[in-house]
Design a protein with these regions (language model features):
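Homeobox/homeodomain signature
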Residues: 8-9, 80, 86, 118, ...
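C-terminal cap of thioredoxin/glutaredoxin-like
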Residues: 24-31, 37, 42-47, 103-160
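Detector for methionine-enriched segments
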Residues: 1, 85-87, 152, 160
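N-proximal helix/coil linker or "cap" segments that precede and/or mark the start of modular domains
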Residues: 1-9
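Sparse, context-dependent recognition of short Cys/His-centered cofactor- or disulfide-binding micro-motifs
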Residues: 4, 20-23, 57, 70, ...
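A short beta-strand-turn-helix
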Residues: 8-25
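Short clusters of hydrophobic/aromatic residues that line enzyme substrate/ligand-binding pockets
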Residues: 18-19, 96, 153
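Structural alpha/beta surface segment adjacent to cysteine/selenocysteine redox centers
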Residues: 25-106
């Protein structure tokens, strides 16, 4: 019988958000937009030009605004702007409340009414939940957690 961490890491699929350089075997990163360590890792990945798939792992007990931010990123994805929203959320982690999320959507040229409806939709909630649950099954307990070729790597940015 399986428990936490007993399932294999789900392989990359069409729902994954690939960021960075185009590589055959990108890292898989479970992260949270409010997590300071995730922000450090994100900056390092961007700076170093690596390739990674971003999966949502909002740790609500530590980061109460992370779930809303994850839903905002997925709502932007439905309008073809995941990467842009992802970058905007990490650029200003201190402002993850509704008015600021709407400002970001507007600045990205998104249909703000659709964005707001989408981020509260069952489909977006299910998408974020799928990422989170796949992380739990693969043994993720904190953020950031990085997998390389299916194996969990040290998560602290200075250990990578």
């Amino acid at each position: 019988m399986g428990g936490l961490g007993s399932a294999p890491l789900p392989p990359l699929g069409p729902e994954d958000h690939l960021l960075g350089a185009d590589e055959d075997e990108p890292l898989i990163v479970y992260a949270d937009y409010e997590c300071p360590h995730c922000a450090v890792l994100h900056a390092r990945l961007v700076r170093d030009g690596g390739s990674w798939a971003f999966r949502h792992f909002p740790v609500r007990s530590k980061h109460p605004r992370a779930w809303a931010a994850a839903c905002a990123a997925e709502a932007a994805a439905l309008q073809g702007a995941f990467r842009q929203m992802h970058m905007a959320l990490y650029a200003d982690r201190a402002r993850l409340e509704d008015p600021h999320l709407w400002e970001r959507a507007r600045a990205l040229g998104l249909d703000v009414e659709r964005f707001d409806a989408d981020r509260r939709s069952d489909a977006v909630l299910a998408r974020v939940r799928r990422d989170f649950e796949s992380g739990v099954r693969a043994g993720v307990v904190t953020t950031p957690t990085v997998f390389e070729r299916g194996a969990m790597r040290p998560s602290a940015p200075d250990e990578m």
